[in-house]
């Protein structure tokens, strides 16, 4: 949600985001490319991401796999080698980060999860105070995966419930400009 606000260049209260960063003056900025998760069992992880989230292998180098959307999986033994660490120094299930996905058909996704045998929920699905519905679950290595309702879908759901754009903006705690953009 907040990434979308940042991409739109405005703060939650409607002001334009203003930050000076000397790196912005460079043409060769660093760019986030691929989040990477260390995994104990590559095949089990590929199966989970395919069956639960619908991601497919784009590139498979054996010890490193890139899935649709850019998520990378790395075998634990090669990851520890890259870091110069021991396996015991890698902590799975620390509950201190997540990988975030969005879904247009959130109700359909929840129905899909019911048919997935190995899904372990961090907590049941919930609706945040701004109206976005989310579900958090663990992957086989207990990395937290969040799937949230697409913000355009949230705006449209509220509109379909009879709310005006102004009411939606107030309910979601976002600028009216954000709401009107989502409703186009």
Report the location of each language-model feature.
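Extreme N-terminal basic, low-complexity initiation segments
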Residues: 1-9
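N-terminal beta-strand motif that seeds the catalytic metal site of vicinal oxygen chelate
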Residues: 10-44, 97-99, 150-184
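Conserved short beta-strand elements that form part of the metal-binding/catalytic scaffold
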Residues: 14, 56-93, 144-149
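Vicinal oxygen chelate
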Residues: 40-42, 94-141, 161, 174-177, ...
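Amphipathic alpha-helical segments
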Residues: 41-55
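Conserved acetyl-CoA-binding loop of GNAT-fold acetyltransferases
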Residues: 51-58, 118-119, 174
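A contiguous, mid-protein "functional segment" used to position or interact
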Residues: 136-153
């Amino acid at each position: 949600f907040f990434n979308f606000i940042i991409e739109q260049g405005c703060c939650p209260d409607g002001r334009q985001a203003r930050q000076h960063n000397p790196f912005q003056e460079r043409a060769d900025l660093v760019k986030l490319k691929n989040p990477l998760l260390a995994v104990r069992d590559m095949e089990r992880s590929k199966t989970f991401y395919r069956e639960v989230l619908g991601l497919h292998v784009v590139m498979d180098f054996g010890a490193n796999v890139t899935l649709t959307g850019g998520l990378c999986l790395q075998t634990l033994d090669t990851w520890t080698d890259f870091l110069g660490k021991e396996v015991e120094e890698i902590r799975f299930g620390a509950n201190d980060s997540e990988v975030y996905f969005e879904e247009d058909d959130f109700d359909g996704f929840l129905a899909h999860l019911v048919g997935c045998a190995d899904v372990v929920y961090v907590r049941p699905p919930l609706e945040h105070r701004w109206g976005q519905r989310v579900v958090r679950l663990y992957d086989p290595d207990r990395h937290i995966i969040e799937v949230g309702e697409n913000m355009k879908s949230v705006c449209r759901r509220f509109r379909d419930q009879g709310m005006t754009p102004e009411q939606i903006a107030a309910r979601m705690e976002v600028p009216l400009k954000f709401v009107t953009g989502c409703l186009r």
